[in-house]
A protein has these predicted regions:
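Metalloprotease/metallohydrolase-associated module, dominated by Zn2+-dependent proteases
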Residues: 1-5, 10-33, 131-158, 196-256
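N-terminal low-structure segments adjacent to metalloprotease catalytic domains
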Residues: 1-100, 104
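Short catalytic/ligand-binding loop motif for oxyanion handling, primarily in non-cytosolic enzymes
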Residues: 16, 37-40, 180, 188-190, ...
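Short, flexible loop/turn elements at secondary-structure junctions
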Residues: 34, 160-163, 177, 185, ...
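Long, low-complexity, polar/charged, intrinsically disordered or flexibly structured peripheral segments
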Residues: 92-149
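Short pre-active-site segment immediately N-terminal to the catalytic Zn-binding motif
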Residues: 155-172
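Active-site recognition of the HExxH zinc-binding catalytic motif
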Residues: 170-183
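Short acidic alpha-helical/loop segments enriched in Asp/Glu that coordinate divalent cations
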Residues: 185-197
Length: 256
């Protein structure tokens, strides 16, 4: 099921398509018309949520090159409430701080019924989706990202279009695993137990953290570390596959 919204700037075709995953309606897929639009719509939000220098702060511009980090990845993911928090901060006191493509994305989520727009222009998660919806009813308690109190919530994932179908498939699988993390509390808890249990030793966990640090993730946040671990280990076939052992060059499928 999907819906399409007009652009925040008068129907210029830049609004993303919003589709719900049939297997779990809490997972929403955003499809943008091109990679540049997706980067402008989600780049600053990803920095706000995952970048070590900008976490919790709205960047004034998107960094280029190696310093681009999470802003430059071809895949993005976030809880809807996290996107809402970013957008409200980005708007600023005068309501004009959000970029055009960020506004178009939020309007698409409003039209999909996932986000509610207030008269003042601020947004909030629609009550129907504030804890997510599923066969087992609603999650309860306050939303949390702590290890033992993960509440299933509505989330969005996005993947850039590309002429390489295999690349798109790999990136989509990676982002879908993040969707499961947000939407299924039992899955997230299992991943925490695996990562922090006896399956890995301290040296292996340290190596993983260093890998994420080089990709410019905020490794001080345990959820980021474990969430990325499960997504990479469940789907990565290039960086950690047999081709790597054969000495073939490779790059992260998330890099654009």
């Amino acid at each position: 099921r999907d819906s399409r919204a007009a652009s925040a700037n008068g129907g210029d075709g830049k609004a993303p398509r919003v589709a719900r995953w049939m297997g779990n309606e809490k997972v929403l897929l955003l499809t943008f018309p091109d990679a540049a639009t997706q980067r402008r719509a989600l780049g600053r939000a990803s920095m706000y949520l995952e970048d070590p220098e900008h976490r919790g702060r709205v960047a004034k511009a998107l960094p280029a090159g190696a310093r681009g980090g999470v802003a430059n990845y071809s895949g993005h993911n976030a809880r809807v409430r996290e996107l809402v928090a970013f957008y409200n901060d980005a708007r600023g006191d005068d309501g004009r701080g959000a970029w055009e493509d960020e506004r178009a994305m939020m309007e698409a989520l409003v039209d999909a019924g996932v986000v509610r727009k207030e008269k003042c222009g601020r947004v909030s998660v629609s009550a129907e989706w504030s804890r997510g919806r599923g066969r087992d009813g609603w999650g309860d308690g306050e939303p949390s990202t702590t290890r033992r109190d993960v509440v299933p919530e509505a989330c969005v994932i996005a993947v850039c279009a590309s002429g390489d179908a295999r690349e798109v498939q790999d990136a989509l699988l990676h982002e879908a695993m993040h969707g499961l993390w947000y939407a299924r509390d039992d899955f997230a808890r299992w991943c925490y137990d695996f990562y922090l249990g006896d399956a890995l030793d301290d040296a292996e966990r340290a190596a993983w953290v260093e890998f994420l640090r080089e990709l410019r993730y905020d490794v001080s946040v345990e959820e980021i570390v474990v969430n990325e671990f499960q997504a990479y280990m469940a789907t990565e076939r290039v960086l950690f596959g047999p081709d790597t052992c054969a000495g073939k060059s490779s790059s992260s499928k998330k890099s654009s």
